[in-house]
Amino acid sequence: MKTIDQRLEALRDVMRSEHLSAFIFPSTDAHNSEYVAPHWQSREWISGFNGSAGTAVVTLTGAALWTDSRYFLAAEQQLAGTEYELMKLKVAGTPTVSEWIAQQCEAGSEVGIDGTVSSFAETEALKAELRQQGGMTLRLNFDPLTRIWDNRPPIPQHKIELHPLEYAGETTASKLERIRESLRQNHCDGMLISALDDIAWTLNLRGTDVHCNPVFVAYLLMEHEKTILFVDKDKITTEVSAYLSALSIKILPYNEVGKYLKRDYFAYNIMLDSHETSSYLVACAKAGRASVVLKTSPIPAMKAIKNKTEIEGFHNAMKRDGVAMVRFLKWLIPAVEEGNETEMSLDKKLTDLRKEQPLYRGLSFDTIVGYEHHGAIVHYEANEATDIAIKPHGLVLIDSGAQYQDGTTDITRTIALGPITELQKRIYTLVLKGHIQLEMARFPDGISGTQLDVLAREPLWRAGYNYLHGTGHGVGSYLNVHEGPQQIRMEYMPAPLHSGMTVTDEPGLYLADRFGVRIENTLLITADCETEFGKFLRMESLTLCPIDTKPIIISMLSDEDINWLNHYHAKVYETLSSELNGEEREWLRQATRPIEREKA
């Protein structure tokens, strides 16, 4: 196996032969996915960094990697010993990709990026920036790794399965008609869907092509009278074939989508989402003389609002997940006191308990178990090299979730394993206050998550602290654990919040090399009231699991905070207790007992 330095040397040989001064490796695949199958993990292969977000850039004399605050510490560790320089996004003084390339390369240089895995919006922005940074040009039609990546994993070929109506809540025919109505409103004749979760949702199908994401690799072309699924036929079972045939959906090979788009259309308007569609496929559509209409896909907004069946599924999935979490938390402290547990063993125990639950289909992301200083690595993942023993003191941060056939879960709990410091208690309480403030929010229908973000941060800001990751994201219904368009974060996000959306509430605080705290519930946005000022919304927790009360400094909580926590814990006990045995029920009763101020 080649080392990172050997891979860089081989890449530079290819770059010289192609007269390229720099090459850019994004994190995405041909579908602009956040999490990608091994075939498309080019950035990881060339850099060694395995986080879900980041961009590697290699010039003939240097190499750099950009990533966000979730991965700063992990990236420092993974890039150590290589020539890569870590570029911290949103940190003052960090150059942009194009600025750094301009520092490294001569004016007029040619820069490469694989246009099959780079969205049209991204490449157009890069072209403009590189022109501005010294008249550099961007080449899109070349992937150097085809020459140097030996034994590259193939595009996955796992079987596709039906997602029954009893869990989907809406027929595929109904979804197709809703999408076609959007095409009519936008005066378009067709639409190419690239996003894998959008395709899975539209067709009520699921797959296992991407780790932890129940999707399959395909494209979907919709026209007013015709629907074509571009997918390798080996993935289609007899059952799925009959299902698609009944919907009059034609199947063509996955690798023929570009060829199909190049057909000589006449007076054909095709809708493409510039943020989801690769530059290569946009070029194919233009080569076919179609009139390309660049618009945001209507599907994410449709998918984001869960129907009654999906909401019921979330409640049921969260209940089963809560049972697994309670059993894990009951086991945790005694097991740690015995002295044989590590971060990896905690991960395995929690996964094993989830596997016992009905309709379990796998994890929704790789579990994060960060003990003490590892808790400060926002997206830490223990492995044989980093795994450490868990001691009966300090804090452990556990961020985990599962895929059930009727819903997807995402939960974080930070647990005191024994004595902790006053600073740890103070920060834990500040994070909890922010979590509560956001979950108690009442707000007008249609505002953006940006307008709510301050509620989760305000207690930390007041104390001079902050976290740099987002506060909340949408969650799919047996789909991707990160789902848009709704988000709660500091950066402006125009997507409006509406009843029926899911969103997480996950403020945190991380002190490098010391500890981290994060508390996360998955919430459902619901109608609250309607006044002369319009419709108002509120949020209710779908997650059912005790929040550790041991680290709380009660004097820092308001009466409203205390009432919220006690009400939440009463709900957790009432909902889960009947699913537990006697010992588990007693443990839960103690874990959810009301907190109160000390009497004077």
Feature-to-residue mapping (PLM):
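Active-site neighborhoods and metal-handling regions in enzymes and metal-associated proteins
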Residues: 1-600
